[in-house]
Structure formats: structure tokens, C-alpha cells
């Protein structure tokens, strides 16, 4: 499925697609009782992209907290044994003996692969990304150097994986060449560090940032009560427009990317240390 998604991504006749990731754990289908500000900002970005003729795909990670059986299992850290032991896409699940089944990542890998760009919208939880978002990030390690051929290591054979890496591994970047934008918001502290962590991660994986206006971090209702935070977002028309600008910047980047012009201004340099 990921291979088919890669073909759709590369097909110049296919529609331009942007994956919108809602990183919040909060929604109106469980204990919080109301939608997140993150989802509202994502909807602003989605509407802007669709007005620009971009096909959108909304990946709402808050469903992990509100849908029965919805799971992203944790990364097992195969890459730290040897990079070729980590498969693209991940082959660690399902593990029926441990009841590690129904892994959402099997679908999520395909959705990332098919997208020409991604916009991640996320709140700050304790200076960091929320756990649903971090689970997905960790499981995407296989996109940066992962082995697309599990048979090369006879499945999960550490010795064979180590031998492959020592013989020379090129650490293929399976999602490189896609554009990205970020919207990170908080109420008291941590927005810049959280946004930089996401930027650094995507840069490392070979994504291309869509420009300074595509990387947004803002406080909404700074030191105001949580109970009125949606009112604060209602009043903050500037941050709503900035969210639209993130989407506009990404939409323009996708056009340039698919025409080959965005890559043309990127330095095509070999990495002396590709890990």
C-alpha cells in the first residue's frame, strides 16, 4: 500500500494533496466535552487549502482517546540495534502473541506517503508534543533510513541487520521532498521549543519547509482561564489569519514543488554523515 501511495505521490497528473495532522488529544467525543482549539485552527487551514484547489486529508490523532480499539503502538527502538532492522513501513506490528494488534500506523504510513505536503497543528503539553503526536513521530523513524526489504534481515535477525549496516547502509529517506508547515499554540509557555522540535524533525527527514510564514507558534489566551480559551481564539482574528497564511504558504510550496522549482533552489549536496 505504501508503494502504491508513493506512485500516486509521484504521478504528475494526480491532484495535489496536503495531509493535515491534528496533534491534540482532546475532542468533544469524550471527557473534555468540547473540541480542541487545535482542531479549529486545523479547520481554518483546511478551508484555505481547499479554496486554493488543494485536496486535503485530515488525520485527527485525538481519535486515539475517543474511538474504541484505535491504537498507535509504541516504537520498539529497532533502529538502535541496527538501522536495517527497522523496516519501512514498520513491520513490528501486529504481534498477536502480545495482543499488539489494530495498529493505526499501517494506514498512517500510506497517508503520509501519498501527501505532497503536511501541516501539523498541535498544542503544547508540558513543553512538548502531546502523546498521540509523539507516538506517531516515533513510529515514523522508519521513514528516515528504514529497510524496505524485511527479507534482507530474515525478518528481525539482529546479526544480519548489523552486518548490513556495517557493510554500508545508505539510510534512505522515504518521505524526503515533501513540503511542510506548522501551527503550534499554547497558553503559558513552551511554544517555541515545541515548534522547533517539530521543525528539526521534519528537516532531518528531508522535508522542505514552506517558508517563514509556514512555521507558526502563538499563545492563545495568554495566562487567561482555560474555561474561556475558545473565546480567546474567537477574539484573536490575527492568529486565525496567520493560520490561513500557513496554509497559503504550503499551497504555494506544493505548486512550486510539483513543478520542480522548489527543489531547484535547494542545495543538492551529499551528506557525509547520513545517519
Set out the residue ranges of the language-model regions.
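Short loop/turn segments at strand-loop or loop-helix junctions that form parts
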Residues: 20-24, 218-223
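N-proximal short alpha-helices
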Residues: 106-109, 167, 223
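N-terminal beta1-alpha1-beta2 submodule of the flavodoxin-like/Rossmannoid cofactor-binding fold
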Residues: 1-152, 230-275
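Short, glycine-/small-residue-rich phosphate/pyrophosphate-handling segment
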Residues: 131-132, 148-215
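Short beta-strand elements in bilobed, periplasmic/extracellular small-molecule ligand-binding domains
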Residues: 53-60, 208-217
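Short helix/strand-capping connector loops at secondary-structure junctions
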Residues: 219-233
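Surface-exposed beta-strand edges and their flanking turn/coil or helix-capping segments
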Residues: 71-72, 195, 222-225, 261
Amino acid at each position: 500500500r505504501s508503494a502504491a501511495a508513493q506512485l500516486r505521490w509521484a504521478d504528475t497528473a494526480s491532484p495535489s494533496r496536503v495531509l493535515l495532522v491534528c496533534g491534540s488529544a482532546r475532542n468533544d467525543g469524550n471527557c473534555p466535552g468540547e473540541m480542541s482549539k487545535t482542531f479549529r485552527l486545523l479547520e481554518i487551514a483546511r478551508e484555505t487549502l481547499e479554496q486554493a484547489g488543494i485536496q486535503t486529508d485530515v488525520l485527527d490523532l485525538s481519535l486515539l482517546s475517543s474511538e474504541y480499539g484505535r491504537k498507535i503502538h509504541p516504537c520498539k527502538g529497532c533502529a538502535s540495534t541496527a538501522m536495517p532492522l527497522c523496516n519501512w513501513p514498520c513491520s513490528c506490528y501486529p504481534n498477536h502473541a502480545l495482543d499488539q494488534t489494530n495498529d493505526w500506523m499501517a494506514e498512517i504510513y500510506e497517508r503520509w506517503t501519498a501527501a505532497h505536503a503536511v501541516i501539523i497543528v498541535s498544542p503544547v503539553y508540558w513543553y512538548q508534543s502531546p502523546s498521540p503526536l509523539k507516538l506517531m513521530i516515533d513510529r515514523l523513524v522508519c521513514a528516515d533510513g528504514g529497510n524496505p526489504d524485511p527479507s534482507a534481515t530474515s525478518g528481525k535477525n539482529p546479526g544480519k541487520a548489523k552486518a548490513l549496516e556495517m557493510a554500508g547502509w545508505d539510510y534512505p529517506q522515504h518521505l524526503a521532498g515533501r513540503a511542510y508547515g506548522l501551527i503550534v499554540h499554547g497558553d503559558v509557555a513552551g511554544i517555541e521549543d515545541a515548534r522547533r522540535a517539530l521543525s528539526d524533525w521534519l528537516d532531518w527527514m528531508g522535508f522542505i519547509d514552506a517558508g517563514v510564514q509556514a512555521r507558526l507558534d502563538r499563545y492563545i489566551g495568554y495566562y487567561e482561564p482555560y474555561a474561556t480559551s475558545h473565546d480567546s481564539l474567537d477574539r484573536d482574528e490575527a492568529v486565525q489569519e496567520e493560520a490561513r497564511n500557513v496554509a497559503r504558504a504550503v499551497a504555494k510550496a506544493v505548486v512550486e514543488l510539483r513543478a520542480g522549482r522548489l527543489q531547484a533552489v535547494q542545495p543538492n549536496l551529499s551528506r557525509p554523515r547520513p545517519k
